[in-house]
């Protein structure tokens, strides 16, 4: 490992929390290794690992992965670098209560990062030409600039505190999970390879994924959305799928394949529309372009791949009162 990368790793693990406990100390006492290998039971996503692949960088905590003298992984090792579909992996540093700033800028050989469920408060990822997977779900991060990660295929920054994110310079992006943040908008028009998108539980009012013809897995629920413009999944990007909300509520959209325990598709699919009435309003139904009510279900499961242009209608509840 080169001097720069070793110093970057040492600095991250030297950071201490409010009780003076360093990240390195936490890793030694809290790390828990999970893995999926060829012999892992097909009904399990992963298994506990009593032994790990011999890739630990000398003088640094477990989870710093060195291969052929290069820093290639932090918190995760993917032996064959085969991301889609992911066949095998070892994960080391989830839920270790790691804190502070994750400055990996200039770690030009780093390919994979997996630091889910920690307390990392900020990240600097400048000059990261090799990074393909960035997994930082469930931390305390308020900002992420991915513009210098041109090879990145997967970003999971869900369950953080982001108010915005710019992915316009990530043309290789296949997965983007930004759910449970504070986003008010999201532009994916420059991500033509995007297949998996999670934006649920933000503050987005208008979502347009028509620039993502390969999108097959979308969760856009739990937002104050008044309009969603998408393409019917499985239709090669030719058929519209649009939802709008009349005054009195919001809409949500989800579609996805059904997966087994190892995140492989079963051949079954789901496509659903969701209506959210405001306080004082009731949902009336879903209306098509002709004005016909086609469903009165708040959460309507449709046929996967259906092309529709729908409007969710709501009516205000009028409370009558009488004087005695």
PLM regions: where:
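N-terminal capping/linker segments that flank leucine-rich repeat
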Residues: 1-100, 108, 224-250, 256, ...
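C-terminal capping segment of individual leucine-rich repeats
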Residues: 67, 83-85, 95, 106-108, ...
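Conserved hydrophobic position(s) of the canonical leucine-rich repeat
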Residues: 71, 86-88, 99, 110, ...
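Conserved hydrophobic beta-strand positions in leucine-rich repeat
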Residues: 74-76, 89-92, 113-115, 132-136, ...
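Consensus "Asn ladder" position of solenoid repeat domains
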Residues: 96, 118, 136-139, 157-160, ...
């Amino acid at each position: 490992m080169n001097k720069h990368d070793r110093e970057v790793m040492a600095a991250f693990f030297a950071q201490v929390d409010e009780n003076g406990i360093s990240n390195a100390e936490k890793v030694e006492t809290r790390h828990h290794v999970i893995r999926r290998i060829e012999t892992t039971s097909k009904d399990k996503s992963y298994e506990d690992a009593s032994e790990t692949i011999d890739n630990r960088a000398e003088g640094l905590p477990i989870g710093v992965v060195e291969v052929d003298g290069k820093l290639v992984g932090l918190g995760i090792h993917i032996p064959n670098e085969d991301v889609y579909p992911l066949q095998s992996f070892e994960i080391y540093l989830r839920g270790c209560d790691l804190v502070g700033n994750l400055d990996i800028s200039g770690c030009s050989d780093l390919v994979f990062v997996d630091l889910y469920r920690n307390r990392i408060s900020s990240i600097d990822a400048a000059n990261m030409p090799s990074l393909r997977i960035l997994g930082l779900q469930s931390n305390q991060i308020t900002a992420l600039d991915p513009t210098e990660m041109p090879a990145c295929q997967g970003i999971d920054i869900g369950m953080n505190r982001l108010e915005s994110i710019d992915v316009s310079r990530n043309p290789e992006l296949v997965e983007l999970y930004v759910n449970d943040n504070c986003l008010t908008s999201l532009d994916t028009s420059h991500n033509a390879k995007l297949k998996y998108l999670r934006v649920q539980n933000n503050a987005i009012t208008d979502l347009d994924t028509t620039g993502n013809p390969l999108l097959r897995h979308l969760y856009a629920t739990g937002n104050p959305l008044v309009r969603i413009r998408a393409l019917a999944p499985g239709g090669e990007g030719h058929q519209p799928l649009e939802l709008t909300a009349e005054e009195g509520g919001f809409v949500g959209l989800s579609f996805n394949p059904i997966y087994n325990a190892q995140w492989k598709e079963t051949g079954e699919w789901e496509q659903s529309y969701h209506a959210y009435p405001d306080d004082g309003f009731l949902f009336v139904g879903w209306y098509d372009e002709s004005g016909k009510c086609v469903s009165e279900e708040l959460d309507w499961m449709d046929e996967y791949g259906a092309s529709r242009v729908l409007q969710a209608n709501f009516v205000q509840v009028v409370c009558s009162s009488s004087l005695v």
